[in-house]
Design a protein with these regions (language model features):
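Non-globular targeting/processing and membrane-anchoring segments
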Residues: 2-157, 171-173, 181-356
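Short glycine-rich or small-residue beta-strand-to-loop segments that form or flank ligand, phosphate
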Residues: 157-163
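Conserved redox-active cysteine motifs that mediate thiol-disulfide chemistry
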Residues: 163-174
Length: 356
């Protein structure tokens, strides 16, 4: 892992949810989705000691029992004291461990059923949803005249740049996981949740760290810059996980600028998540509001992906159809059953591009 560092939190964009007053979702994302890093090694404060029994006050001298009885009482008293001390230490350590575990959601292998749900969404569901969602969904920014992306000498390609703590990345990963499963097979997908202290607290999602997509059509690379593990004593900071390669960094730096993203920060920097589909379609910030995933387990979300009337599914698959249309444009319409589907064709029409 790379060293930790500290940066301000800003940037990002996402649609304003229906009926939500006050600060818009777009502004909220801009204020919270810029990469956050940490200074120094992660660590927690030392645990406080437990309470040990306090001996009672001495009273007037009592008649002394026989020596053998005194020895037995002393022995049993010592055993009891040891048992109490062990119990206290156990409770203190258990409490300390629970407190530490509550500060973030660990990354663990994705359950097989969740991965299967993501990979086996019926085509009829994709088509029924198309680009129709009860929740607002932002379209990717479409570029023209740019060369196809090359990563590790392979083209076409798609690049994702985000962080495990980021709630906007949490929402976007559901759409990416479903869309990319139409073009290949996932391996080593993990589950986790966004920050427990950021907005849209503990949004359940995937982690793409260490995950791979085996696809004959597209090269996919993911960079999870930071974990969701807080750095002690540095609010809003998380431990570093992964750095972009020089090739990936050049793509991120170029296409996250205001030249290609009208809403990019004038002060520079990249908004999480940043998604570049073959230098054709750019996503900066969440496509839909992660708030709609509040209270949903991984299984709740994945098991609903086959239901085109589910509002959460509609937001995820609308975003996924937009991504699929951009990928299909890059793969020259392959695979045919995906790229000629009515859902992808509707997305391509909405984006003003061809899906073949």
């Amino acid at each position: 892992m790379a060293d930790k560092q500290q940066k301000p939190v800003t940037g990002g964009n996402k649609p304003k949810p229906t009926g939500n007053g006050g600060q818009s979702a777009k502004d909220k994302s801009r204020a919270a989705s810029r990469p956050v890093a940490a200074k120094g090694a992660a660590g927690g404060k030392g645990g406080k000691g437990g309470n040990t029994p306090r001996p009672g006050k001495s009273g007037a001298a009592a008649p002394r029992p026989s020596g053998s009885r005194t020895g037995v009482l002393v022995a049993w008293g010592s055993v009891a004291l040891v048992v109490v001390i062990i119990a206290v230490l156990f409770i203190v350590n258990a409490t300390k461990s629970t407190t530490q575990n509550l500060s973030y959601t660990p990354v663990t292998p994705a359950p097989a059923q969740v991965v299967s749900d993501v990979a086996n969404i019926p085509l009829s569901t994709w088509n029924k949803v198309g680009v129709t969602s009860q929740f607002p969904v932002a379209k990717p920014n479409i570029l023209s005249g740019q060369p196809a992306m090359t990563l590790d000498g392979k083209s076409p390609a798609m690049l994702y740049y985000g962080a495990e703590y980021c709630p906007y990345c949490a929402a976007e990963r559901w759409a990416m996981a479903t869309a990319l499963a139409r073009f290949g097979t996932w391996s080593n997908l993990k589950i986790t949740a966004s920050s427990h202290t950021d907005v849209d607290t503990a949004t359940n999602t995937f982690s793409f760290y260490g995950a791979t997509l085996d696809s004959p059509y597209l090269t996919f690379k993911a960079v999870e810059q930071y974990t969701n593990v807080p750095v002690s004593g540095t609010p809003g900071a998380y431990t570093n996980l992964q750095n972009p390669t020089k090739e990936e960094g050049a793509i991120i730096s170029k296409y996250s600028s205001s030249k290609f993203l009208p809403n990019a920060s004038s002060s520079g920097g990249v908004s999480f998540p940043f998604v570049n589909i073959n230098n054709l379609a750019l996503i900066s910030g969440a496509s839909y509001d992660p708030q709609i995933l509040a209270g949903q387990t991984w299984t709740d979300i994945s098991s609903g992906l086959s239901d085109p009337t589910n509002p959460i599914t509609q937001a995820i698959l609308t975003t996924g159809n937009y991504m699929s249309a951009a990928i299909c444009n890059s793969t020259k319409g392959q695979p045919g059953d995906v790229c000629t589907s009515s859902g992808v064709q509707a997305a391509a029409k909405a984006l003003g591009i061809s899906a073949s």
